[in-house]
Amino acid sequence: MAGSGQERARHWRYPELPGVDLLRARFVEKIFVRHTHENFVIAAISDGVEVFHHGGADQYAGPGALALVNPDTPHTGRAGVPEGWRYGAVYPSPELVAEIAAETTTIRGTPGFVSPVLDDPYAAGLVHEVLRAAEEGNALAADTLLRVAVTRLLRLNGGPLPQRGVHT
């Protein structure tokens, strides 16, 4: 990977994609301690390998794969190779994913991802295209590509999430 050793991240919001955070990053030594996100994580790996602890086991995502984390799901993150990993990610809100699922899939209930890693270079490319469209200010392309990507991921690797009880 070119420029090995340099860590960088750009996190932003594109006003024309409400409810979605965007990220481009490259990490070598960064270690993410156990944490959660309110939104979904859809991270497309470009180079290197990301290892993340999820569901009681280490998961490995390399080039062309996606790391997929449902909201409020504890996970970690670190490099799986000395060169680190480079990725682009979208963080759509649960409400947006539910809207897309209702319009484009047969999933009933709260939609989510079944497996935390999916090897799908086409879907990974769609995530990178969403980021590119947002950077270029192309709202129609960014929204369309995001919806196509989420639809594809839900059709290939989606299902209803288990109901969570209310704790008092």
Q: What is each model feature region?
A:
Residues 103-165:
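Amphipathic alpha-helical segments enriched in hydrophobic/aromatic residues interleaved with Lys/Arg
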Residues 8-109:
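N-terminal regulatory/effector-sensing and dimerization cores
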Residues 1-5:
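Actinobacteria-biased recognition of intrinsically disordered, low-complexity terminal regions
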